[in-house]
């Protein structure tokens, strides 16, 4: 009887990578080129901190060789040892055959230049909010700033914190603030706790397990940040294998993608200070959000790579 071929999670036969001969790949850039070719051949999806196969390949190569991504150019033509080459080929093979996000394979992702631990208990963070903290919350009379000064922010809430990366970025950005971070997932909070500890912020970032505002009592905040589940039913059905490897809970926003967003907007007024505000990421659903909440004067904030995916609303406009 013929042996059954190994299957992927989606039921297809797992792709096989041709054996690489000794000496065929020599330098870091050789392994990047080889990776890109295999990634393109396998039609991988890129949406987890990198947006193209070249950046993904460079990220994997650097992590495997214990290099910061910023160091790749300096070592691009350096030779790779035999042991390092085997490690790299194993990683490339895993990325192609498992379709897991690269960040899961190396247990790391970078946001705003800072490293964060990730594994399959959390969605791989790729929020625009970190960039917006820098561009719209600088104060000091900066054009477009939504606050007077970062030091004036005393309490921040991060809803649906996942790995805790946004809570940590907020703690760095607002030096006088304490940060509460909430998630319903026990596993996610375990990952967040590791990240908070590794960044030395245990005294300033407090983790809470619960459903949105439920564990917070009557606490009020100067700023609420959230990147909640916002994928609609149609989008959930079309997720690529890389996204299906992540926790479904972190994506699923209900039929129209707004189940969690509605609850946040409904309850946020009870947890904001009079001069506070809410910043919320909703993906590419701006038109739907505007139609669902025509009475709200939402301010849509753009970044270098996004347009109309994050909104701001002041506490006074939510009452």
Curated annotation (Swiss-Prot):
CDD domains: AdoMet_MTases
Pfam hit, one: MTS
Keyword Cytoplasm: no
Reaction(s) catalysed by this chain's protein: L-glutaminyl-[ribosomal protein uL3] + S-adenosyl-L-methionine = N(5)-methyl-L-glutaminyl-[ribosomal protein uL3] + S-adenosyl-L-homocysteine + H(+)
EC number of this enzyme: 2.1.1.298
Cited Gene3D superfamilies: DNA helicase RuvA subunit, C-terminal domain, Vaccinia Virus protein VP39
Matches recorded under SUPFAM superfamilies: S-adenosyl-L-methionine-dependent methyltransferases
Annotated InterPro entries: DNA_methylase_N6_adenine_CS (IPR002052), HemK-like (IPR004556), Ribosome_uL3_MTase (IPR017127), SAM-dependent_MTases_sf (IPR029063), Small_mtfrase_dom (IPR007848)
Any one Gene Ontology molecular-function term assigned to this protein's record: nucleic acid binding
Keyword Methyltransferase: yes
Gene Ontology cellular-component annotations: cytosol
GO biological process: methylation
Keywords, ordered alphabetically: Methyltransferase, S-adenosyl-L-methionine, Transferase
Family: Belongs to the protein N5-glutamine methyltransferase family. PrmB subfamily.
Function: Methylates large ribosomal subunit protein uL3 on a specific glutamine residue.
Xref: PANTHER family: 50S RIBOSOMAL PROTEIN L3 GLUTAMINE METHYLTRANSFERASE, RIBOSOMAL PROTEIN UL3 GLUTAMINE METHYLTRANSFERASE
Protein name: Ribosomal protein uL3 glutamine methyltransferase
Organism: Bradyrhizobium diazoefficiens (strain JCM 10833 / BCRC 13528 / IAM 13628 / NBRC 14792 / USDA 110)
């Amino acid at each position: 009887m013929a042996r059954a071929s190994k299957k992927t999670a989606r039921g297809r036969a797992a792709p096989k990578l041709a054996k690489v001969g000794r000496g065929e790949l020599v330098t870091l850039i050789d392994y990047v080129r080889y990776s890109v070719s295999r990634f393109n051949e396998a039609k991988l999806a890129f949406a987890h901190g990198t947006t193209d196969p070249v950046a993904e390949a460079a990220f994997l190569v650097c992590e495997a060789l214990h290099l910061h991504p910023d160091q790749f150019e300096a070592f691009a033509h350096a030779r790779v040892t035999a042991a390092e080459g085997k490690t790299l080929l194993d990683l490339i093979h895993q990325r192609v055959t498992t379709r897991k996000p690269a960040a899961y394979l190396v247990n790391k992702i970078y946001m705003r230049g800072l490293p964060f631990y990730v594994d399959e208990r959390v969605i791989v963070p790729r929020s625009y909010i970190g960039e917006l903290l820098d561009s719209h919350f600088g104060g000091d009379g900066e054009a477009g700033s939504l606050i007077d000064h970062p030091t004036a922010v005393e309490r921040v809430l991060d809803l649906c914190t996942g790995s805790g990366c946004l809570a940590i970025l907020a703690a760095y950005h607002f030096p006088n603030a304490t940060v509460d971070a909430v998630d319903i997932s026990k596993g996610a909070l375990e990952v967040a706790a590791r990240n908070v500890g590794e960044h030395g912020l245990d005294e300033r970032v407090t983790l809470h397990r619960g459903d949105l505002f439920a564990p917070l009592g009557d606490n009020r905040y100067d700023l609420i940040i959230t990147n909640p589940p916002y994928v609609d039913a149609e989008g959930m059905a079309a997720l690529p294998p890389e996204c299906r490897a992540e926790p479904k809970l972190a994506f699923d926003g209900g039929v129209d993608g707004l189940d969690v967003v509605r609850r946040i907007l409904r309850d946020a007024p009870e947890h904001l200070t009079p001069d506070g505000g809410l910043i919320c990421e909703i993906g590419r659903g701006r038109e739907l959000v505007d139609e669902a909440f025509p009475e709200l004067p939402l301010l849509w904030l753009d970044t270098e790579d996004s347009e109309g995916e994050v909104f701001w609303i002041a506490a006074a406009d939510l009452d």
